[in-house]
């Protein structure tokens, strides 16, 4: 529908009825699996350096693990409790079957990529990851000795009989089920045994180079060594078969925060049992006999649609260790030197003169570290307040906060204990900070604190001035080198006041307060996004140019999706850059033909969130910690901050939005059929990669 077509405003109830058709929505779980295919495509791209292709393969495997631990576990929960279907109309049982079909193809493609493409390519360049049948005599002799000296002493094989029931198997660990024939020392007839590989054992073993005939750097999987020599654990018995397997379990921690008095203690108790929760997936060697598979399924409480046959090591993601162990720069992305802030030794003076925008990893994260380090050492700084979601193991951020507290400054840190898979690390972090005198709070009951905020209060003359850092990504110097994220450092008084009020809400019992500049979940961000989408819709109905460009990691919030459909019908031109799952179906005639959705998958993980609204010639641009997901907009503490400096807003539009819309090398476009297709340069267009162009500009 063209933007000049007369469209009558519709009521909310009419909109709800109009967009009730399940065919207008894509399934979140299947869309998330689609993203893994796009990551895997990078592993097959011959333009990508070989060891980087290996890393992309491992990322796709790790992503799939987390998908089962969280998303599939959630769907199984919905199935168990008979929860209603999502807007796409798919019921949990249908979703699980569809997930199985799509995952089976993904797993096949992953192992085909490893066995047929990457492993042979690495071998041709002198990096061998050797299977059992390719060991030479000297390698096999060395590995037998390694097994006897380093592996065998820590193994505890368990024969299965009435006195030895099926053992507890920890989440995502390597195990071998062994079929035995013979009589043991106590006269028991052998049948099945389980060998668990302790997590203390290395999953990748490097062979001494002198064992190679051609000087190659060679590795073997622990699973290959176990399978080859497992018979030594059962002397006098015949091993009829040894099959590796791995079980994946529900890893979503569940704590009733309204019922617990001590959140940290409750989480510690949950973490103890997390590795043994309900199973959601069984990976098993493809040659394992069906009766044994059924035995495992029965013990794990799984159905046939939870089994995945594996043609290779069940823990394929562990081959990522080879990336770090092979020191071959020509097989990796070339290093780069990110931009640094000039005169960063005087960071407060720089920020006082004007807002500072950083686009990581092209701009170094060291500027953020400098800000905090200088604040910790500056006698004029009176207070520091910060949120921490993920920080990494050796965090300069944490060290600076501790230094500040020990120097007598008032330091308050909101540590989110429920950051997925970082709960244990954050519990330790909270303890460390508290021991140093930092006031630690755990956020708000019922809401994860996902906002990225740093507030520094500094005395300047007779006044106190607030300095603020806001970001789309974590305070994590490691991910800042491989994730794209935006940082704003500002001394803007209105923004500083808003951030101060947010910290009062998080650390105390302050009531909801009206903010001047920032939008905040769970209070104003959802409504603020809807308002701006509807404003563009109104402009389009009046015949004015109207446009929305938004970049995020994922999109599924139903009201936002419906508002975008209404905007499209009114003629608003909408470009969405959504890296991962997207439930909106673009390009549907009469509904969403004015919406285009693309996903960028390249060297760096796209992580920044940016919302741009044309606003009838007075554009508004926001950066945010939140995706357009239900959880982010309604069930988390998030921030969305405006870029008030017009020059900085133009830079973001150019480098972060338009640049990605021009990309024709790393872009995938979502069709109305729900299929992502890789874009290729047209004959009259030069090849263009947004990430490569930004690197070249350094």
From Swiss-Prot:
ATP binds at residues 63, 483, 579, 607. Gene3D superfamilies: Endonuclease Chain A, Polyphosphate kinase middle domain, Polyphosphate kinase N-terminal domain. GO terms for molecular function: ATP binding; metal ion binding; polyphosphate kinase activity. It catalyses: [phosphate](n) + ATP = [phosphate](n+1) + ADP. Mg(2+) binds at residues 390, 420. GO terms for biological process: polyphosphate biosynthetic process. An intermediate of this reaction is the autophosphorylated ppk in which a phosphate is covalently linked to a histidine residue through a N-P bond. GO terms for cellular component: polyphosphate kinase complex. Its EC number is 2.7.4.1. Keywords: ATP-binding, Kinase, Magnesium, Metal-binding, Nucleotide-binding, Phosphoprotein, Transferase. It is an enzyme of class 2 (transferase). Its cofactor is Mg(2+). It comes from the Bacteria. InterPro entries: PP_kinase, PP_kinase_C_1, PP_kinase_middle, PP_kinase_middle_dom_sf, PPK_C_dom2, PPK_N_dom, PPK_N_dom_sf. The active site is at residue 450. Catalyzes the reversible transfer of the terminal phosphate of ATP to form a long-chain polyphosphate (polyP). PANTHER family: POLYPHOSPHATE KINASE. Belongs to the polyphosphate kinase 1 (PPK1) family. This is Polyphosphate kinase. It comes from Xylella fastidiosa (strain Temecula1 / ATCC 700964).
